[in-house]
Amino acid sequence: MVYKQHNMGSYTIHTIKTDRFKNIGIEVVFRNNVDPKRCAFRTCLFDVLLENNLEYKTKRDMILMQEELYNSLLYSVTYKVGATAISSVVLDMLNPKYADYNYLDDAIKYLFTAIFNPNITNNEFDEQTLNTVKNRLIADIKTVKENPTKHALQNALKVMDEESLSALNIAGTVETVESITPSKLYEEYKEVLEHDYIDIYVIGDFNENEVIDSISNYAKFDTIKTHEVEINNTNKTRKKVLEQRDESNNAQSQVVLIYNTNDLTDYEKKYTFQIYNMVLGGGSLETKLYHKLRDENSLCYSLRSMYQKYDDLLIIGTSVDKSNVSLAIKLIKETIKEMLTEVTDEEIATAVNSKISAINMAFDEPGRIIDEYLFRNISDLDDAETRIEEYKNITKEMVMNVAKKISLNTIYVLEGGDSNEEN
């Protein structure tokens, strides 16, 4: 696998040469600082761009063209990492060497037509297309409430700090989506093209010069950006733990505990605390939380701990019967305390092996390989070989030391089940 960067002035092309896959993947990555007021507009924009454009006037026209391009797939995704908003337009295509003709240029032209020839008239996006996307986004936002786990997590982060970027839904709210007009979306489109950093990743077995020439012919990005894009999002700590309970019609209660990670070194963020989380509850069925809550007390089916590195948060969530909520919280706190003194060499070895396996598996899929190089470029992620060697150096003493560097911020319960089970 050979990786190269090609500076094109207003954007960068990243080529990843490998013959492991029959497809070629092209991902156009737009990146900027999160703006809470614009998140809904951004998410909506990238969905609208792929509905139709001035050349392919309907969604059906788009799909028919993709079928002509050997069933190529074009899609977009918008997400948030810490304080950074990322939107990717992705083309997954069969390598032309397996096709009847070299259609690479046609496919790349199709990709950039979606970006640079949108369905805009008189500085306004097509209203019917916009309404279709808005209705879909609103439905997606509302369905979060139908997923108790996601709903509880979203609520818990808002309870922790409603103003924090960690609590922000990148799709926005129903109200903000409803406020999007054709002219406002056009303003967002101009804003993204003028101010987002652009990186184009290409992975597969291809002629490098041919790909670069084709992309440079259609990628008409012309603004050089110099501002800083910050990925780390700082959350406030709390002297007194905040507790809140809300009621729901769910069969079980959702329990969420949010901890701040405090004063971790860069190395601890990248390596030691990753292993801490794997031992605690982010790894296999051999974690401390799993043993404490499920094996020893048969409390739950769903249990997870998540380390949000770029938000300095550790989040623990579980689903239990309402009568067991207080016990579950007590046991989680006990497990956190055990991490200070009761970590074993065997637990470290299991966690490290899981991490190494995950790193190796990331190179089995083109999209995950692109993510690997993307985060090497926009964050402090080390290369895979370095990460594997550093994880092997983690000891139980190092993990027990970082266990001192967390503090409980918020306990949130989305209560379900019989309201008489627990007062």
Q: How does the language model describe each region?
A:
Residues 138-143, 240-252, 357-367:
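Short, low-order "capping/linker" segments at domain edges
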Residues 14-16, 22-34, 40-42, 59-113, ...:
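M16 family metallopeptidases and their MPP-like homologs
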Residues 1-17, 207-245, 401-423:
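Proteolytic maturation boundary segments
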Residues 52-55, 96-100, 117-126:
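Short, polar/flexible loop-turn hinges at active-site or ligand-entry regions and domain interfaces
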Residues 14-41, 46, 190, 197, ...:
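His/Glu-based metal-binding/catalytic segments typifying zinc-dependent metallopeptidases
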Residues 182-218:
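Non-catalytic, conformational "gating/processing" segments within enzyme and secreted inhibitor domains
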Residues 78-81, 186-193, 305-308, 400-404:
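Short, flexible, solvent-exposed loop/turn segments with mixed acidic/basic and small polar residues
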Residues 63, 117-141, 227-237, 334-362:
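Acidic/histidine-enriched alpha-helical segments
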